[in-house]
């Protein structure tokens, strides 16, 4: 009997330990945030920091959640807060959440980027009571998942992809693209050529990076040979960059100056030659 009791006690203790381990693991796993570690930020422009999270409160509407972004070294130094008075003066009117907290989206936008906005910045979530909007004890700062901004004083030049040579009278397509980190205010790509066929695409290339692409199609003429074509990218905030290349047009030989006189000559010969032959046969 004692051994049976010992077996039961051992089984019970093992069960409790397993249950505690599982609960602890599940609890810690519920407070999670996914934030890019580093992202480029063009000075004077804007940057959008992708962020998603999970919490212990289950499915809650945005009104029951409070999202805060703060400096890593000082949780009270808020760069974004729904209470405007709690935002650091340097960041007032420059930050907003572009994601919906109720959809576990904590994506942050910073506009008018300054060269000292480098961070690191961390996200904090608080569960609140709807009746008075006071935070509950359920809150978490994701200080192990923060973002640092890599400051860019100048924008990168656009990338141009093109065929080496254009053919006179045939469609010629060239593509200009630029990488950026502000999908809420995308760069504007323009050409120094007029064309009714310009197609623009925007593509998410992950980790907070986006690509804006402009494809230009023209039908070059002989006069366009050695013409310089420029693609200009204008970023939010006014900074610009450009890329220029020289268009080489392959000429199509025109043989009309040979064909037309030959046809005229043959026609004239036939016009006057045939009656002469007929008359010669008649009087022969």
Model-predicted regions and their roles:
Residues 37-40, 93-116, 129, 162-165, ...:
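Extracellular beta-strand/loop-rich beta-sandwich domains predominantly from IgSF
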Residues 47, 116-126, 172-174, 187, ...:
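Conserved Ig-like domain signature around the intradomain disulfide
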Residues 59-62, 130-144, 239-244:
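Beta-sandwich strand segments
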């Amino acid at each position: 009997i004692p051994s049976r009791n010992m077996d039961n006690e051992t089984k019970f203790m093992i069960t409790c330990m397993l249950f505690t381990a599982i609960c602890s693991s599940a609890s810690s796993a519920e407070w999670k945030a996914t934030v890019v570690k580093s992202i480029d930020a063009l000075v004077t422009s804007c940057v959008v920091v992708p962020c998603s999270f999970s919490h212990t409160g289950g499915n809650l509407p945005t009104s029951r959640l409070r999202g805060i972004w703060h400096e890593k070294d000082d949780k009270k130094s808020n760069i974004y807060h729904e209470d405007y008075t709690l935002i650091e003066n340097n960041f007032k009117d420059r930050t907003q959440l572009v994601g919906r907290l109720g959809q576990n989206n904590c994506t942050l936008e910073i506009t008018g980027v300054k060269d000292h906005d480098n961070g690191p910045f961390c996200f904090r979530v608080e569960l609140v009571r709807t009746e008075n909007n006071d935070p509950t004890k359920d809150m978490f700062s994701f200080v192990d998942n923060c973002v640092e901004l890599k400051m860019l004083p100048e924008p990168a030049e656009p990338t141009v992809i093109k065929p080496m040579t254009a053919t006179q009278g045939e469609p010629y397509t060239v593509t200009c693209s630029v990488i950026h980190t502000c999908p809420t205010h995308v760069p504007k790509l323009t050409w120094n050529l007029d064309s009714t066929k310009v197609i623009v695409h925007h593509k998410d290339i992950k980790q907070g990076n986006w690509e804006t692409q402009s494809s230009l199609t023209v039908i070059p003429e002989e006069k366009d040979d050695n013409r310089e074509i420029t693609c200009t990218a204008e970023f939010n905030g006014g900074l610009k960059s450009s890329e220029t290349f020289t268009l080489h047009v392959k000429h199509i030989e025109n043989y009309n100056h040979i064909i037309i006189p030959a046809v005229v000559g043959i026609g004239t010969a036939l016009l006057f030659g045939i009656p002469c032959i007929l008359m010669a046969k008649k009087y022969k």
